[in-house]
Amino acid sequence: MRFFLDSANIDEIREANRLGVISGVTTNPSLIAKEGRNFREVVQEIAAIVDGPISAEVISTDAEGMIAEARELAKIHPNIVIKIPLCAAGLSATARLAQEGIRTNVTLIFSANQGLLAANAGATYVSPFVGRLDDIGHDGMDVLRELVEIFDIHGIATEIIAASIRHPVHVSAAARAGAPIATVPFKVLMQLVKHPLTDLGIERFLKDWESVKDK
């Protein structure tokens, strides 16, 4: 399973990229708004740091508006993937953009049926929101597992991005479910790196080394 970073914070993206474990970045209007910077500038800067897919989301609610935005975003950098919400207009826009060779990441997916529709429209990626489903008492991993199974049965090339990841358990569960990609917040990525026994082991090794290095 590959990792994307779900962030628009340049410092976080730089630090995560230095680890050598992220293959792409996902953003959304909320994440970019938190940075208080120009949208295009942020996306350009991310593209200069990470050599992989960078999802940038449209804000229009009609198909024609989404398509127009997508065409402009796609001009920023070859790695830009257009993030489009799952709705009737979004499906229409996705189908048109696929015909033009513009890659898409259909987001805000909460059922396997929605993911299947997006794939049929020509989406490059689909992003089921695991954590938000958990928030309303559903099992987000059940939806993810169902979607993975359906795509496998039918040989669907669209890649699944496990999204709305809240904690490390979501990550390992997504990997077990067969998701090819998980997009994780910086905080969760750092939680994956750390383990108290690892820290204790390093401390013990250093202590043992100090006791013998001058002998």
UniProtKB/Swiss-Prot annotation:
One of its GO terms (molecular function) is transaldolase activity. Pfam families: TAL_FSA. GO terms for biological process: carbohydrate metabolic process; pentose-phosphate shunt. Coiled coil: none annotated. It catalyses: D-sedoheptulose 7-phosphate + D-glyceraldehyde 3-phosphate = D-erythrose 4-phosphate + beta-D-fructose 6-phosphate. Its EC number is 2.2.1.2. It comes from the Bacteria. One of its GO terms (cellular component) is cytoplasm. SUPFAM superfamilies: Aldolase (SSF51569). Pathway: Carbohydrate degradation; pentose phosphate pathway; D-glyceraldehyde 3-phosphate and beta-D-fructose 6-phosphate from D-ribose 5-phosphate and D-xylulose 5-phosphate (non-oxidative stage): step 2/3. It is an enzyme of class 2 (transferase). Belongs to the transaldolase family. Type 3B subfamily. Transaldolase is important for the balance of metabolites in the pentose-phosphate pathway. HAMAP family: Transaldolase_3b. This is Probable transaldolase. The lineage of its organism: Bacteria, Bacillati, Bacillota, Clostridia, Eubacteriales.
